[in-house]
Structures are given as structure tokens and as C-alpha cells.
């Protein structure tokens, strides 16, 4: 029984020696410092984005998010403004008249 206890302690000591002492396991596979320094050397450095460059801009260089907020505020937070709704209603009425429908005519 004492033999198994000594073997158990011996195996654990050898394992800790291999892992902590040399940094390798058996066949030379690096576990600690060498591989971790290589991995950090290959990591790209973080890019710090400024607030203005992180946002998309339109062709004129204006900030799209700010423009959309202004448009929605002007429309009263509706998907379409009153002008657009009136235009679409007029177009639908013209199409219905062209088709010969007198009242709401859907395909």
C-alpha cells in the first residue's frame, strides 16, 4: 500500500517538474513562456477609433446617424413624413384611375 502512495507522489512531482520546471511536456511542446510570447507578438494592436470615424458618412461627408435623427424628429418619429404619404397616395390614385378602378382597387 505504501508503494502506491510513493508512486502517486512521484508521478505528480515529475508532472509538475515537467510543466513548471522546463516549460515543456515530454516531446518538446512548449506550454508556458515561449509559445505565449510568440502568440502575443502575432496579435494585432488594437485600433482606437475616434467617434467621427466610427460612424458612416454619406457622399457629402455628413454623418448619417445625425441626419437620420434630424429627419425623424422633423417627421415626428414616423417612418414616412406627411409629404411622402401624400405623394404615395396621389400616385396610387393615379394608377387606380389608369386601371379603371373607381374605388380602392388592389391586384
Swiss-Prot record:
The modification 4-carboxyglutamate is found at residues 83-84, 91, 95. Transmembrane segments: none annotated. One of its GO terms (cellular component) is host cell postsynaptic membrane. Residues 25-80 form a propeptide. Disulfide bonds join 101-105. Conantokins inhibit N-methyl-D-aspartate (NMDA) receptors. This toxin is potent in the following order of preference: NR2B approximately NR2A/GRIN2A > NR2C/GRIN2C >> NR2D/GRIN2D. Induces sleep-like symptoms in young mice. Is a highly potent anticonvulsant compound. Belongs to the conotoxin B superfamily. This is Conantokin-R. It comes from Conus radiatus (Rayed cone). The lineage of its organism: Eukaryota, Metazoa, Spiralia, Lophotrochozoa, Mollusca.
Amino acid at each position: 500500500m505504501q508503494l502506491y502512495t510513493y508512486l502517486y507522489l512521484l508521478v505528480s512531482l515529475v508532472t509538475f517538474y515537467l510543466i513548471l520546471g522546463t516549460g515543456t511536456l515530454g516531446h518538446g511542446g512548449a506550454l508556458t513562456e515561449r509559445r505565449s510570447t510568440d502568440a502575443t507578438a502575432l496579435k494585432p494592436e488594437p485600433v482606437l477609433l475616434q467617434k467621427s470615424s466610427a460612424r458612416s458618412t454619406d457622399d457629402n461627408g455628413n454623418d448619417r446617424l445625425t441626419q437620420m435623427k434630424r429627419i425623424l424628429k422633423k417627421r415626428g418619429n414616423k417612418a414616412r413624413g406627411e409629404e411622402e404619404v401624400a405623394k404615395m397616395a396621389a400616385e396610387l390614385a393615379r394608377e387606380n384611375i389608369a386601371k379603371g378602378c373607381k374605388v380602392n382597387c388592389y391586384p
